[in-house]
């Protein structure tokens, strides 16, 4: 029986989105508490009940912590960027929590993690969006990340 693995950084990205979602939903600014909750979930594979038996899940703890800490440190800048990419008829206060969490983490990695190529960040978070969001939101994520990547490239 062969063992399947999912990329550790991909899992770290999903976990970071979950941590930021928890931060928004619970209005909990205790970053260490949030990270510990999410890490304990992933470190206990028994808590993930719908996985195929031979699928092993582990995350890059360093990447996860770096993403969450970076989002917390840059949250106001990230929200400003997100809100600036909304059309005039969209109210930032009505943005779905999961969409905002995913955008915070993805934009953070795009702007503040220069070792990860923009194309990888866009592909990874579009894939994550595919599993978590509706079709319109997936397109929005892809569009925003693409625009930010192009803007960021011009600034370098």
Swiss-Prot record:
Please indicate if the UniProt record lists Isomerase as a keyword. Answer: no
Q: Name the InterPro entries for this protein.
A: NusB-like_sf, NusB_fam, NusB_RsmB_TIM44
Q: What does the record give under GO molecular function?
A: RNA binding
Q: GO CC: one term?
A: cytosol
A single GO BP annotation from the record? transcription antitermination
Coiled coil region boundaries: none
Pfam families for the chain: NusB (PF01029)
Keyword terms:
RNA-binding, Transcription, Transcription antitermination, Transcription regulation
Family the entry assigns: Belongs to the NusB family.
Biological role: Involved in transcription antitermination. Required for transcription of ribosomal RNA (rRNA) genes. Binds specifically to the boxA antiterminator sequence of the ribosomal RNA (rrn) operons.
- Entry protein name: Transcription antitermination protein NusB
- Source organism: Rickettsia peacockii (strain Rustic)
